[in-house]
């Protein structure tokens, strides 16, 4: 979801849930897919991306570094050992970027208790966020 928001051609989303991604595209000067070096992202798009009402949702038990669906190449491992670590680092990095641009940051970090890489638990956690007023 975060890559769609960052690189997509429309700006209609009012809210977005980004849950348990295996790796992230950081707003750093490193090559895609782990960064945005040489990628066509306008300043307006970057500001819109950071101002969307978003939620990074992470299962507190999604910590298996050997999960079969977890990307484990060098670029991914530099983000953290597991989905939980990677998500926290991605959120924290975006907080710093929004602060450096002196702009509002409307994302939240939500840790889902007793959840590993389980879609059903993430959907239950996402529903209240998606249904609340923007």
Please provide the spans of the model-predicted regions.
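Residue-level recognition of the N-termini of beta-strands and the immediately preceding loop/turn
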Residues: 13-14, 52, 103-108
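Short glycine-enriched nucleophile-adjacent loop
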Residues: 1-9, 124-127
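Surface-exposed acidic, glycine-flexible loop patches that form ligand/cofactor-binding
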Residues: 7-10, 43-48, 99-101, 134
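Short, flexible loop/turn elements at secondary-structure junctions
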Residues: 5, 20-23, 60, 111-116
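The feature captures the conserved acid-bearing segment of alpha/beta-hydrolase catalytic domains
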Residues: 14-96
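C-terminal catalytic histidine-bearing segment of alpha/beta-hydrolase fold enzymes
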Residues: 91-134
């Amino acid at each position: 979801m975060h890559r769609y928001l960052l690189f997509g051609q429309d700006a209609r989303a009012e809210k977005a849930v980004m849950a348990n991604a295996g790796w992230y595209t950081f707003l750093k000067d490193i090559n895609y897919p782990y960064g945005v070096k040489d990628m066509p992202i306008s300043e307006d798009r970057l500001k819109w991306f950071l101002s969307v009402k978003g939620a990074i949702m992470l299962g507190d038990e999604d910590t298996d570094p050997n999960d079969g669906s977890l990307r484990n190449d060098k670029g991914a491992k530099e983000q953290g050992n597991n989905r939980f670590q990677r998500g926290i680092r991605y959120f924290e990095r975006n907080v710093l970027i929004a602060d450096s641009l002196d702009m509002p940051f409307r994302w939240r970090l939500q840790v889902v208790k007793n959840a590993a890489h389980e879609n059903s638990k993430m959907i239950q956690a996402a529903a209240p966020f998606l249904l609340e007023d923007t």
